């Protein structure tokens, strides 16, 4: 594939130890050579070497910067094109000047994600691997980065390719049946093979979909809402979990008048913590807005932490809150265990039934470990770090897998009902195409452009 040569700054803008300008394309080395002065021309250096020299403005012959230049020849590069990386001192002025020179002498400013897009278009990675690159960049826990790295290395892709190959084998058998309809034994054998392999494919798709919830948590974070009536210790809990003081903690009920969000790594599980305003009837218009936002956050939550006060009796307000959350994934936290007891724990247990209950003192930082373990076990059922690393974490992949499961089931139902094989073939072919969309074998140009537009510039 013959593409023009692109350039961009690949390091964050601002002062820093180094800055990198990256070029990729057929003219990458030639353009860099026009700006570089060193011991030998970049055109003549060995691939995958770093070369010391200077960037010169050819028009004025002025030395712009002292640099180290990496030359990487196709096809053994990320994009499978020639790549040049100019390493200079960090700083906005110099790196921008080098970037401008590369564009003056023939390169085009890269679009967001264009390097990764070229890696996909040139066959180095498939679409699911390309999407995993962004997941890796955005990872908020070690676990999430390992899951993304497994996908970059092709673990999910290999699974999808195996299922597509199995479908092709079924389709080949179906073709024999269509070509020789007069042989009953061929039809019987075809139906037997089709049902056996199709059910195996459906089982494998279901296994992948079973990881979807956990995978999305790894990718996007577990949306966790802390809820309770005012002044039960919700903000103190947030602060203990994030070990920060973003949420204001006072003795005045209703201090948190908005939803506050923080990401935190809880035993390998990324939590997107949302501390809400206390949900209660209020005449304060500002607090009322916060209460409405709290209700909205509750409706979107993956997990709810329902906080009660050990120092107060159970109230109608507590019961109303429980009614709102009783059908959700929730953990009940009895806080302020360091104070005098006024809460009847048996009454609480009767109300919440099988819902997990943890006793804490946020002031003395007691019970935090038990809470973290309960959160982990509720969604991952044990040690997150020691579980298998293959998850489906992307909403697009999950949607396509569900479609593929439906169409393979249609093929199974049709075969069992004695529908003609050429009709069954349609469902099988559609399943093969849907699975291909996951890895980009049958994705539209519009979808590809949309996915890569979400990447950062320089990646």
Curated annotation (Swiss-Prot):
InterPro entries: G_TrmE (IPR031168), GTP-bd (IPR006073), GTP-bd_TrmE_N (IPR018948), GTPase_MnmE (IPR004520), MnmE_dom2 (IPR027368), MnmE_helical (IPR025867), P-loop_NTPase (IPR027417), Small_GTP-bd (IPR005225)
EC top class named in words: hydrolase
Domain TrmE-type G: 221-380
Residues annotated as binding K(+): 231, 250, 252, 255
Cofactor: binding comment: Binds 1 potassium ion per subunit.
Assigned EC number: 3.6.-.-
Quaternary structure annotation from Swiss-Prot or TrEMBL: Homodimer. Heterotetramer of two MnmE and two MnmG subunits.
Protein name, as recorded: tRNA modification GTPase MnmE
Organism: Staphylococcus saprophyticus subsp. saprophyticus (strain ATCC 15305 / DSM 20229 / NCIMB 8711 / NCTC 7292 / S-41)
């Amino acid at each position: 594939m013959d593409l023009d040569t692109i350039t961009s700054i690949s390091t964050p803008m601002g002062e820093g130890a180094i800055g990198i300008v990256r070029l990729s394309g057929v003219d990458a080395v030639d353009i860099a050579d026009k700006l570089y002065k060193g011991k030998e021309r970049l055109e003549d250096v060995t691939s995958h070497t770093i070369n010391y020299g200077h960037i010169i403005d050819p028009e004025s012959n002025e030395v712009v910067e002292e640099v180290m230049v990496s030359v990487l020849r196709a096809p053994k590069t990320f994009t499978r094109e020639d790549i040049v990386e100019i390493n200079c001192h960090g700083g906005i002025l110099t790196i921008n000047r080098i970037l401008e020179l590369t564009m003056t002498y023939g390169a085009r400013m890269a679009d967001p994600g264009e390097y990764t897009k070229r890696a996909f278009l040139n066959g180095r990675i498939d679409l699911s691997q390309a999407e995993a690159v962004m997941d890796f960049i955005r990872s908020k826990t070690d676990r999430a980065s390992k899951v993304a790295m497994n996908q970059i290395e092709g673990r999910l892709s290999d699974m999808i390719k195996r299922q597509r190959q199995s479908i092709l084998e079924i389709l080949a058998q179906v073709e024999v049946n269509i070509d020789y309809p007069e042989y009953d034994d061929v039809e019987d054998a075809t139906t037997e093979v089709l049902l056996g392999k199709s059910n195996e494919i459906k089982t494998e798709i279901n296994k992948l979909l079973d990881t979807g919830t956990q995978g999305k948590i790894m990718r996007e974070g577990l949306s966790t809402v802390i809820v309770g009536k005012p002044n039960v210790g919700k903000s103190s809990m947030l602060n203990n979990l994030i070990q920060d003081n973003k949420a204001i903690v006072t003795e005045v009920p209703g201090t948190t008048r908005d939803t506050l969000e923080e990401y935190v790594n809880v035993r390998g599980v990324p939590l997107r913590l949302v501390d809400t305003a206390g949900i209660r009837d209020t005449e304060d218009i500002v607090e009322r807005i916060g209460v409405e936002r709290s209700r909205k956050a509750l409706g979107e939550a993956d997990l709810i932490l329902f906080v009660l006060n050990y120092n107060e009796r159970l109230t109608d307000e507590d019961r109303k809150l429980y009614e709102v959350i009783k059908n959700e994934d929730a953990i009940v936290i009895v806080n302020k265990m360091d104070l005098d007891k006024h809460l009847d724990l048996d009454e609480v247990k009767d109300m919440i039934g099988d819902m997990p209950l943890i006793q804490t003192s946020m002031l003395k930082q007691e019970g935090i470990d038990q809470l973290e373990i309960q959160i982990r076990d509720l969604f991952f059922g044990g040690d997150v770090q020691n579980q298998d690393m293959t998850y489906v974490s992307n909403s697009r992949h999950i949607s396509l897998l569900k479609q593929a499961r439906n169409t393979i089931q249609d093929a199974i139902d049709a075969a069992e009902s004695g529908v003609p094989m050429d009709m069954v073939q349609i469902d099988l072919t559609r399943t093969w195409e849907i699975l291909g969309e996951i890895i980009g074998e049958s994705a539209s140009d519009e979808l590809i452009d949309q996915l890569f537009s979400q990447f950062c510039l320089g990646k």
